[in-house]
Amino acid sequence: MEKNHSSGEWEKMKNEINELMIEGRDYAHQFGSASSQETREHLAKKILQSYHKSLTIMNYSGELDQVSQGGGSPKSDDSDQEPLVIKSSKKSMPRWSSKVRIAPGAGVDRTLDDGFSWRKYGQKDILGAKFPRGYYRCTYRKSQGCEATKQVQRSDENQMLLEISYRGIHSCSQAANVGTTMPIQNLEPNQTQEHGNLDMVKESVDNYNHQAHLHHNLHYPLSSTPNLENNNAYMLQMRDQNIEYFGSTSFSSDLGTSINYNFPASGSASHSASNSPSTVPLESPFESYDPNHPYGGFGGFYS
């Protein structure tokens, strides 16, 4: 009975990932022809969300497989079962940081308007730091299940700078109305503004290799788990082909990766025409994605 239940869950996950890959491919097509900075930022965020949701489902698939292999009493077909709830683990959530300059005498809470609604749920003193750290979560965490959080702390070196650490992407209704995850204010007069969600579009290949090691160790049985072995190429191609578009701020995850990207922001004279998105075609891995390819084991997605 347990095996039949697991097969049904695998099939559901396969369909969800298939839809996310098609969605990401469509956004990538639009990104290649987008002419404005604002549109590219919005599409980049959508592409990232497709990646993040796919990884979240696959991370959950490993946990589900471990539970099913761990034994336990079998359930009858007519027994009441809780609906499948897929929740992101902290290790799978993207994380990035920013420094924002504030006006002299301004309060911390009044200068944190980044387009999203946050609720402060805690504050504590940090050992060795001059200023306390504030903890915020999305206002819609309970009503819509949004897991986005951030931490805010004044810089010890410069009281006019706020160090902000973000974790997770907004999945609430706010995300559709806000074009970027956070505004990064200029720290230098001639510095071009860059937005945090663009810094996150690329994941380090080491991240996927680490995930592959974890998933392969689970030894999925082919009879009960779908295979995404062909999809790894899409992740790696996105990283290799588009790395020139993004960067100069760092992105890191709890898996231990930290990488830099170079994004040629519009209006910056320091970037040559050869680096401009208008002259360099975007070849997205989503373009070659086949939604009808065969499936086998989830571990193959990272192999």
UniProtKB/Swiss-Prot annotation:
Primary location group:
nucleus
Where does it live in the cell?
Nucleus
Q: Write down the Gene3D superfamilies for this protein, in alphabetical order.
A: WRKY domain
Q: What InterPro entries does the record point to?
A: WRKY_dom (IPR003657), WRKY_dom_sf (IPR036576), WRKY_plant (IPR044810)
Is Ion transport a UniProt keyword of this protein? no
SMART domains hit by this protein: WRKY
Query: Which regions of the protein are recorded as binding DNA?
Result: 107-175
Instruction: Give any GO molecular function from the UniProt entry.
Output: sequence-specific DNA binding
> Per the UniProt entry, what are the Gene Ontology biological process annotations, in alphabetical order?
leaf senescence; response to hydrogen peroxide; response to ozone; response to salicylic acid
From the UniProt annotation, give the residues forming the signal peptide.
Answer: none
Induction of the gene: By salicylic acid (SA).
One protein family per Pfam:
WRKY
Compositionally biased tracts (Low complexity): 266-278
Assembly description:
Interacts with WRKY53, WRKY54 and WRKY70.
**Function recorded in the entry:** Transcription factor. Interacts specifically with the W box (5'-(T)TGAC[CT]-3'), a frequently occurring elicitor-responsive cis-acting element.
Sequence similarity: Belongs to the WRKY group III family.
What is the recorded name of this protein? Probable WRKY transcription factor 30
